[in-house]
Amino acid sequence: LETIESEWEKYQKTNQQNSLTAAAIDNLVKIDREDRLLTLVNLIDPNQNNALTLEQLQQLAKHLQTVAQQRGEADLWQIATGINLGLNTWSNLSNDLTSWLYEQNRNLGFTNDNERVAPWQIWASKVNPSWLKRVLESLANQQAFDSITQDLTLADWVETAIVFQYIQRGLINFFDQRIYSEKLGAKLSISTFLTFALIWSLLTNSFEQVSKNSLYSRGCFQMALQILRTFAQRDYFPLYGGIFASFSGSYLKEALDYLSIPLRYVEGTGEKARILTLIAYSNRIRGDYPQARECHQQALEIARQQQDSACEIANLNHLSRLNAIQKNYTEAINLSQRALILSRQQGNSLGQANALANLGYSQVQEAQQLERYDPEIYQSSIEYLKQGLKLAESLQDWQSKSLCCSSLGLAYLVLERTQDAINILLQGLESAKYYGDVYLQGLLLTYLGEAYYQDKNFEQAIYMGSLGMYWLHEIGAVEWRQAASLLTVIRGKNIAAFEQTFSLERSSLIKSIGLEGYQYISEILSKYQQGN
């Protein structure tokens, strides 16, 4: 009986796989030719209940080749060829998927710099000459994709889609095992999700703007959305972080339409709200405040409908921060108070820490705006900020700690407590570095530049301001202009002294951002002074 049962289960499984493969072939053959690529992308979407497995993809490629020969359809043959190439390439790469993680005395990451080792060149060396190899080499050399998006076949694109998907999924599975620690595993998984989503977003833009190939552009965009959709289901999804990618116009509409498909929610969470939160945060950092506000408002409404209190609190906090940036401090205070009350009711310590940081910061700024100089007002605000900082430290939440430190440091600067500001901002900078938040690092470096300027330590002001401006400019954050303004003021007081100090800081700056980064600082400053 056990043998019969085992054979029956095996038969059912095989029959189901054959049925799925047959259905996939039927879909690809019958659908309009211009829709075949997107249909394939949908068939390999891991968010689907019946996403094709490696074995089923092999069967699909085999049958597609037969159908393509019978019907004389080149695009079906190209798709089949791309699937086979992708499976073979993945087979060659899979053994080296994680070898780059074991480089000694190097930090982990996906960018090549003095402190990190990235996997792109290692993987490129394992790949035969192909369009995929050129993509990997572009990533290794940190080059734009514009020069390679005009010369590829359908098979090239399909191979890349399959290989990148299995690389990303393999790394996520590896990191999610928490082989190092829970926090480090989550951090590496987050980095992987965002890196591959960003790669597909960059390819989307290159195909759209350079090669004018809307088919490949739409395919890349769908791959990015699939990654974000999977990411939104993870318990470590960063409600207080962003991807620094721009979604606008028809692509934003397509994102909303795609994510409106009925989804399996995790603990009542609306994935669409979480992805919108991520996109909105990114838009705020880039300075697109209207788009950020619109996305946060939509995310807030959906989160309430789905009873996702963590997402609701996060968007209240983000909207508070956005209003504070736009100097609408009364509304910022109101939103942060609502976030604080709700987070305390729900026992959401992370939301509470962020709400306290926003509340204290907004109160200090409003008092300055209204020219109120009552010490009790400032002391009350600083107490909120200290509570938030203490809470973030107890959670070992380095991102929230760096946010609290930045707000507290600014409050001290307003009160001209310069040394207190420097001390707390340095703490925040260390936390931001540990967490790997480039935006907060750039912001804290800029604030430190202003603090040292207030302290008349112009050497440190130039050093910190230069680093802050560089990192913020690198990620497209609008606050780079704040750092550039500081450096311009210092330079305006004594050009010769500024240039001499900048030269003296050369070795320290090169150690942090490399020779090209050091040289680029002057270009960024010149760009600001020319009004660009």
Model regions and ranges:
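Alpha-solenoid helical-repeat scaffolds
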Residues: T160-L335, A339-L342
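Structural signature of alpha-solenoid helical repeat junctions
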Residues: E271, C311, G351, I377-S380, ...
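TPR/TPR-like alpha-solenoid signature
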Residues: G270, T277, N317, A357, ...
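Tetratricopeptide repeat
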Residues: A255-L259, A292, H296-A299, L319, ...
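Short coil/turn linkers that connect adjacent helices within long alpha-helical scaffolds
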Residues: Y265-E267, I302-D308, R344-N348, K390-D397, ...
